[in-house]
Amino acid sequence: MTFDHDLKASVRTIPDYPKPGIMFRDITTLLADARAFRRAVDELVNPWAGNKIDKVAGMEARGFIIGGAVAHQLSAGFVPIRKKGKLPHTTVRIAYSLEYGIDEMEMHVDAIQPGERVILVDDLIATGGTAEGAVKLLRQIGANVVAACFIIDLPELGGAAKLRAMDVPVRTLMTFEGH
């Protein structure tokens, strides 16, 4: 059994969720499987083990779970990137494009110091709109975005390619065809 197949087997697919035609890739089953979760975190961390990473930034909400584990393994701090209005202290904010509209995300203004080496983490990359916004937000406050890591890539939707075009190396552990 290959690494990709082994981890893929721990991801549940839910057809027609949240709307018809979508194949929702549910990582909660991977998170519930201790061996699969550990393996996924180890594989996301592996390229940067032994390198200086100051912070791991995780996008709401599953990026918090994965990002916290990655930060722990790298002995780095963790920074949540949240939807507008969810953080209690002074924030820096950016608007970003969604498939059908615009939203805003923010982080604490003092969460990252200029020049700090940051890895962006989330569970899945699809169109890349949210991840692109997060990279722009991190760079806006002076972060050196070393890489973006995702468990799942939906390559047909072009998100990983969008980040690579921004000179952000992308690490994914598996791909699924379609939406």
UniProtKB/Swiss-Prot annotation:
GO terms for molecular function: adenine binding; adenine phosphoribosyltransferase activity; AMP binding. Its EC number is 2.4.2.7. It holds the Pfam family Pribosyltran. It comes from the Bacteria. Its main location: cytoplasm. Gene3D superfamilies: 3.40.50.2020. Pathway: Purine metabolism; AMP biosynthesis via salvage pathway; AMP from adenine: step 1/1. SUPFAM superfamilies: PRTase-like (SSF53271). Coiled coil: none annotated. It is found in: Cytoplasm. It catalyses: AMP + diphosphate = 5-phospho-alpha-D-ribose 1-diphosphate + adenine. PANTHER family: ADENINE PHOSPHORIBOSYLTRANSFERASE. Catalyzes a salvage reaction resulting in the formation of AMP, that is energically less costly than de novo synthesis. This is Adenine phosphoribosyltransferase. It comes from Bradyrhizobium diazoefficiens (strain JCM 10833 / BCRC 13528 / IAM 13628 / NBRC 14792 / USDA 110). The gene is apt.
